[in-house]
Amino acid sequence: RDDVLTYLEENGCYTIAITNLPDLFEKYRLCYGQYKYVKFALGFHPELVYKYKNQIDKFRSNIRYTRYIGEIGADFTTEDYREREIQLEILSEIVSVCNQYDDKILSVHTRKAEKQVLEILNNCKSQVILHWYSGTIREIEEAIEKGYYFSINHQMIRSNNGKKIITKIPLERILIESDAPFTMGLEKNYSIKFMDDIYKFLSVTRNVDEEQLGIILKNNFRTILTQG
């Protein structure tokens, strides 16, 4: 992963690098905080909060070092109801802490917990990006009405449900993510070429040439940084 960060920096790729625990954010901020193109997000991944819930204090103490928050959220693939409760409690606390600032941008995980997460986000004053969204079309419409953005990756265009979801999102609300190393083809070797397939898919489905598409997507990124 250190090689990936160096690759992004050397290639001038503006990137928000997501972390999954406050410990890791702290580590990478100290090691790579001087990078120009790569900025680190303070994360507390829902699948880890039950085991590491004591790190919420470290989350609070590190939030002043970044405006980027993620990955956070809830993941109800677990059948443990106590774990689900803890996920929602931690998410609510994170939203509350972020509301004390006026510049936070949140990358939010919602897998199988879209309804519950969107309810908590009703109280959120920060800008929201829904990461690898896989919920219902009705909830997409609700999120769009609230001004949320959606980050999509190349693995989404390899499933019918993923493609269906992407076609329902306004082009002006789309951001590109890799979700490496958890997506196909990026487990070991990272390259920004993963974006090529996304550009081709969006170009065909939206009838927009790739050059214009690039302008729109870059503008989306600039816009959310300005609004956050």
Regions found by a protein language model. Give the residues of each.
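Mid-domain alpha/beta scaffold segments of enzyme catalytic cores
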Residues: 1-228
